[in-house]
Design a protein with these regions (language model features):
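A short, aromatic/hydrophobic, helix- or strand-capping loop or linear motif
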Residues: 48, 90-92
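An N-terminal domain-cap segment
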Residues: 2-13, 17-58, 64-71, 75, ...
Length: 106
């Protein structure tokens, strides 16, 4: 049975989160947290979402955001997740070893 579509309407306020695949660590050192913050800022320049707050933990992160266009939260989450995964694989030389994130958002 397929998963029901996620809510992603313009103007809504959402708590989104994502965690490491198998709850693995995705931020190993301070530089990883800083790189992800840069990814967030770049994503905000590309996608029409407002970010109200965020919390980064070693194996997951939380975002409170509002999409300004229907469907934009999903595009934003996909972009930051994919960009972080590419950076992670490049930095830690794990390319080809599978997904880094579990792709969860509410």
């Amino acid at each position: 049975m397929p998963r029901p579509p996620r809510a992603d309407e313009a103007g809504g306020l959402y708590h989104a989160l994502n965690r490491g695949n198998l709850r693995a660590t995705i931020f190993h050192k301070d530089a990883d947290f800083e790189a992800f913050e840069r990814i967030l800022h770049e994503g905000l320049e590309i996608h029409q979402v407002e970010l109200f707050s965020f919390q980064l933990m070693p194996n997951h992160y939380h975002l409170v955001l509002r999409p300004l266009v229907d469907g934009e939260m999903s595009r934003f989450m996909g972009w930051i997740g994919g960009t972080h995964t590419m950076r992670y694989h490049s930095h830690y030389h794990t390319s080809g070893m599978g997904h880094v994130l579990s792709l969860i958002h509410i």
